[in-house]
């Protein structure tokens, strides 16, 4: 300070410097105002969502006429086929558009000299992609989404954490969400990634079980102004679990009852994503042996944790035995099952094999789980 002849107290700004700084502020005020007006111009999202819902109702109606197994990455693409018409939805992928199903026939590529499109080819750069999406969300009213494999979410973590911290509406499409991706083996099969993402404050981690839940999770993500969202999707086809048409968004509560075999039950089974159809099979198999249960589909733990105590008790406290099933690391489910519950999942690195064989290897099949539940009872 002495060498620089700086004789001011800490945090004291010399008047001459302060005046010069304020001149810059005045000079830039009008430019800042014009920039803000241009980039935050009001696009009527509510009106556009109403138009979108009309198209979605038609897809749902057609879907229930012909229920069949579909990968949730495919059902997400079906949503994007109509949602890509939203004027402020900007898509992209880290060179995995064909695998993530993030690009549809309605997308136009953003490229040098032509920024009128709504889809960005980011290249093999997950970290850069998520940083760019943060910037898009921060400076405009645009809603960015980008895709990669769930295993590569680790490359995205710093930017995801910042999006959650800054309360930005950014949507991450993470496909190939479990050992269900099959032969690519343990290097590409996510195990601990869902737990890691769920531990980030102010981040919704969705893992939908079928087309209906996928559409519901997308709907919530688009409407969540202050919270970024992960949507984890399957590579493999899975059986639909919602078999009756409903226009109410049941996923908004994070977890809800999807199946019950009797009024008085012995077991609560909680599951997410591709394992929800497995949970339903187990529920029916137990009923043939006079053991009655209910299945709770939980596409979003964070939303469930926000529910009131009465609702959570209704879901979790009806039975002494609570069981969780998810093809992922299991520890994060113990807050629901308790120490006396059962947690079925994958607590080791995966294997390279057809996905059904890998599920059998880790005991994620109807017969194995039914037997272990009976032993517990």
Report residues per predicted region.
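Terminal amphipathic helices with adjacent charged low-complexity linkers/tails
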Residues: 1-53
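Thiamine diphosphate
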Residues: 1-12, 16, 30-232, 237, 314-315, 366, ...
């Amino acid at each position: 300070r002495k060498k620089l002849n700086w004789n001011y107290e800490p945090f004291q700004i010399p008047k001459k410097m302060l005046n010069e700084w304020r001149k810059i502020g005045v000079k830039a005020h009008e430019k800042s105002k014009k920039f803000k007006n241009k980039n935050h111009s009001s696009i009527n999202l509510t009106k556009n969502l109403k138009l979108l819902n009309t198209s979605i109702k038609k897809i749902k109606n057609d879907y229930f006429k012909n229920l069949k197994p579909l990968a949730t990455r495919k059902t997400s693409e079906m949503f994007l086929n109509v949602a890509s018409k939203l004027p402020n939805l900007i898509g992209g992928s880290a060179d995995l558009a064909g695998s993530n199903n993030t690009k549809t026939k309605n997308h136009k590529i953003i490229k040098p000299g032509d920024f009128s499109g709504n889809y960005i080819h980011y290249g093999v750069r997950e970290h850069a992609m998520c940083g760019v999406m943060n910037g898009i969300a921060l400076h405009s009213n645009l809603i960015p989404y980008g895709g990669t494999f769930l295993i590569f979410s680790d490359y995205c973590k710093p930017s995801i954490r910042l999006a959650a911290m800054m309360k930005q509406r950014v949507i991450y499409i993470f496909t190939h969400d479990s050992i269900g991706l099959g032969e690519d083996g343990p290097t590409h099969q996510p195990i601990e990634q869902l737990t890691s993402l769920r531990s980030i404050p102010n981040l919704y981690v969705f893992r939908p079980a079928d087309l209906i839940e996928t559409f519901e999770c997308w709907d919530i993500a688009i409407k969540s102004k202050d919270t970024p969202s992960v949507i984890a999707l399957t590579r493999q086809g899975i059986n639909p679990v919602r078999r009756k048409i409903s226009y109410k968004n049941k996923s908004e509560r994070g977890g809800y009852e999807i199946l019950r075999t009797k009024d008085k039950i012995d077991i609560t089974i909680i599951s997410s994503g591709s394992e929800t159809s497995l949970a339903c099979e187990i529920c029916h198999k137990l009923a043939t042996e006079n053991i009655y249960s209910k299945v709770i589909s939980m596409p979003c733990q964070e939303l469930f944790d926000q529910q009131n105590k009465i609702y959570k008790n209704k879901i979790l406290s009806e039975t002494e035995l609570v069981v969780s099933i998810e093809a992922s690391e299991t520890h994060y489910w113990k807050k629901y099952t308790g120490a006396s519950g059962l947690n079925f999942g994958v607590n080791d690195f995966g294997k390279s094999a057809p996905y059904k064989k890998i599920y059998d290897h880790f005991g994620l099949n109807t017969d194995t789980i039914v037997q272990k539940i009976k032993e517990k009872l």
